[in-house]
Amino acid sequence: KHLFRSYHDMPKLEKKALDLARGKVLDVGAGAGCHSLALQKRMEQEQQKGSKAQNNIFSIKTIDISPLSCEAMKLRGVKDIECINLFNPQLGNDDGFDTILLLMNGTGIAGKIANLPTLFHRLKSLLNPNGQVLIDSSDLKYIYENENGCFDIDLNGPYYGEVDYQMVYEKTEGEPFDWLYVDFPLLKSIAESCGLEGELIAEGEHYDYLARLS
C-alpha cells in the first residue's frame, strides 16, 4: 500500500521534493510511479490554467529497472516509462534534465558508500545547466545510540549506513541486495568532491532529510 500512495498520503519530505520539481523531470527508480503520477497531475493542472511560470513541469520521464514495476506503472497511468538502468548510456542522449528525483531513500541505489561518487557523477552528466537533483536519505546513527546518549559505532568497520535489504510480500521473497543510507554531512562532502553543491532542504522527524544537489 505504501508504494501506491497518493500525494496526500506522502510524507512531508516527498511532498516538498515534488513541489520543488520543475522543467524536464526524470523520476529514477520510480517503483509503482506514485511520484510521477502526482507530477503528471500537477503538469495537467498547470497546462489547463495556461500557466507559463518558470517552475512549471514541462515533461516527466519515469525509469525503473524492474519490468514488473514498469508494467504496474503503465497500468496506473504513468505516461512516459522506460525500463532502463540509470547508468545506461542511452539515457539522456537526446537532452538533459532540469530536475532528477531520487526519493524513498534515493541514495540506496549506490549500494555502498564507495559507489556514491559514481552515482553523483552520472547524475551530474544528466543535468541541464541550472538543473537540480532532489534526493532523500536518513542518518542511521540512531540505531547505535546507547542509553547514555552516545553512539557505539565501529569506526574501523564498514560505513554504518550500508545495509542488506530484501523485499518481502507475504510468502514471496526477493533476492537480498546492498542498500545505502547516508548522513547529510557525508553526502554533502562527497557531492562537492564530484563538483556538485549539496544543500539541506528539509529534515524529517526521524533522522531523515531532503537534499538538493546542483
Where are these regions (language model features)?
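Conserved SAM/SAH-binding beta-strand->alpha-helix loop
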Residues: 66-67
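A short glycine-rich, Lys/Arg-flanked "PGG" loop and its adjoining helix->strand segment in the class I
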Residues: 117-129
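Conserved SAM-binding strand-loop segment of SAM-dependent methyltransferases
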Residues: 77-88
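Conserved class I S-adenosyl-L-methionine
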Residues: 23-31
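SAM-dependent methyltransferase
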Residues: 129-186
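S-adenosyl-L-methionine
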Residues: 1-20
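Conserved SAM-binding loop of SAM-dependent methyltransferases across substrates and taxa
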Residues: 32-44, 54
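A short SAM/SAH-binding and catalytic strip from SAM-dependent methyltransferases
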Residues: 97-117
